[in-house]
Curated annotation (Swiss-Prot):
Function: Has a glutathione-disulfide oxidoreductase activity in the presence of NADPH and glutathione reductase. Reduces low molecular weight disulfides and proteins.
UniProt name for this protein: Putative glutaredoxin-C12
UniProt-listed PROSITE patterns: GLUTAREDOXIN_2
Main location: cytoplasm
Lineage top rank: taxon: Eukaryota
Amino acid sequence: MAEMVARLASERAVVVFTKSGCCMCTAVTTLLGELAVSAAVHELDREPLGKEMERELARRLYGSGGRGGPAVPAVFIGGSLVGGTSKVMTVHLKGELVPMLKSAGALWL
């Protein structure tokens, strides 16, 4: 499963793993959309292996036990895990998100 998540996370400059109906997922994808980023979005509750992928994302976000909070949204930029909602919003408010997106080729501003 780790290889599958890594492959999906690297398919585009920005990849977001979400669940339909998740308000925090909507907040992150809306922010990226407002920045004119075309992210690949994978809704785990609509993926055949979504539960397994969610466990792998939780492991990546919170360590080997995979416990500590929600696994979605999980945002990857340039193939690297940035984090969930709080991390994405923090780097955005610090002015670091746009440079990350530019570096990954997701923005041309």
